[in-house]
Regions:
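Conserved DEDDh/DEDDy metal-dependent 3′-5′ exonuclease domain
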Residues: 2-85
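Acidic, Mg2+-coordinating catalytic module of metal-dependent nucleases/exonucleases
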Residues: 79-142
Length: 142
């Protein structure tokens, strides 16, 4: 998701994503926020796409900011601790992998749609957590 402070624009890249497409999406982005991204997302992108996101934008892993505030666990655990609810509470990381597999092996459009909806919700929740930890306008105080 890309937030300009006024709103959140969600861009989803999948299935044969090219480094150029991600580079275009990140063009002009100053800061990138992830949850456990320093351990998963960024190394995955660096390995698969040969793209160093941290060289393009300042990266903040909200997992560590959560830890400093006594919020431990995965993204869903932090959401629960903050009282956030999900529209898709039955979908978790394992189910996301299963949905991707169904899409890739059976060309299951419904599985892909559900996965993309789950990912959109992840991004929106992450933005909410970022705002709770950082505030709406200011620079992060990590």
């Amino acid at each position: 998701g890309i937030s300009d402070g006024a709103g959140l624009r969600i861009v989803q890249l999948y299935d044969g994503i090219a480094a150029a497409a991600l580079r275009d999406v990140l063009s002009g982005v100053r800061r990138v926020f992830t949850y456990n991204g320093s351990r998963f997302d960024l190394p995955f992108i660096r390995e698969r796409l040969r793209l160093d996101v941290q060289a393009m934008a300042e990266h903040h892993d909200l997992m560590f900011a959560c830890w400093r505030r006594g919020l431990y666990g995965g993204l869903k655990a932090v959401e629960r601790a903050l009282g956030l609810r999900r529209q898709m509470p039955d979908v978790d990381g394992l189910e996301a992998v299963r949905l991707w597999y169904r899409y890739k092996t059976r060309n299951d459009a419904a599985a892909l749609a559900r996965l993309l909806a789950y990912n959109r919700e992840d991004v929106a929740q992450l933005e909410y957590i970022r705002r709770r930890l950082v505030g709406p306008a200011g620079s992060p105080q990590f």
